[in-house]
């Protein structure tokens, strides 16, 4: 008797599966279409043997080229390591590698644009074309405006930390390539408020992604919806059929070990009727202000990303000094 396909195998037939990791071996094993990096994942990569040559090369560059401005040297080495890890990952996946712009720049449109252009140029110098890369930007108003300009330049963007409909709609209007609504962090907020959902169909993170997906499909938006920040395989299964799903290695492993039918939950053909209301900076701000969860989680997410970046830079500074 032929064994039934795993739930991961079935999911691959319904959604593009993305690995939320920079773990080289995990990506080789799990074979996602896309993958993503961030400062935390790059910091973890510093301890992986596969990146040892890259790390030594970039630290040597920092020691040789570092001037009197130690901070600038550390920051440049962090950028070079980030791109170096991305280059290695681009060799493994047939699709895209998301590379995160500094969270410190989340409220600075021009600085975000400049850093994105720099990253794309660094990738090009290392033989990776921009069509292999997504520039990951926090979905503040300033970040969305940066993405609007970058998209016009042919630089595709992944707008992350999406918690609110205003953010999602503003991204679609800006022509953003992809958005990442954070399923698990939305659930975390409501559970902390004592509002645990009775079923997966009432999970506020799942409901949010389904709503955004349906609105985008009904409107004919080309912006890709990629569910992110999952806490369980149940959340993933509840969004089977979403354009893309970025999943941690441990949950990918669980899905690969599970069998049984995995039905499609989202489909363009089943999208609800929806009309978009134009979003400007004022309506964007008021939409966030009226949503305590989104306000808290967006600010907290940016803060966490910034702390992770500073931790990466501190590790690099220590290695350069060692």
Swiss-Prot record:
Keyword annotations for this protein, in alphabetical order, are:
Cytoplasm, Pentose shunt, Schiff base, Transferase
Task: Tell me which EC number(s) this protein carries.
Answer: 2.2.1.2
Oligomer and partners: Homodimer.
**What is an example of a GO molecular function annotated in this UniProt entry?**
transaldolase activity
Question: Any idea which residues are catalytic in this one?
Answer: 136 (schiff-base intermediate with substrate)
Q: Which organism is it from?
A: Xanthomonas axonopodis pv. citri (strain 306)
Reaction(s) catalysed (UniProt annotation): D-sedoheptulose 7-phosphate + D-glyceraldehyde 3-phosphate = D-erythrose 4-phosphate + beta-D-fructose 6-phosphate
Which Pfam families does the record match to this protein?
A: TAL_FSA (PF00923)
Which GO terms are recorded in the biological process aspect for this UniProt protein? carbohydrate metabolic process; pentose-phosphate shunt
Gene label? tal
What NCBIfam families does the entry give?
talAB
The pathway to which it is assigned is: Carbohydrate degradation; pentose phosphate pathway; D-glyceraldehyde 3-phosphate and beta-D-fructose 6-phosphate from D-ribose 5-phosphate and D-xylulose 5-phosphate (non-oxidative stage): step 2/3
Q: Where in the cell is it found?
A: Cytoplasm
Per UniProt, the enzyme's principal EC class comes to transferase
GO CC annotations? cytosol
Q: Function, please? A: Transaldolase is important for the balance of metabolites in the pentose-phosphate pathway.
| Transferase listed as a keyword | yes
The molecule here is called Transaldolase
Q: Which family does it belong to?
A: Belongs to the transaldolase family. Type 1 subfamily.
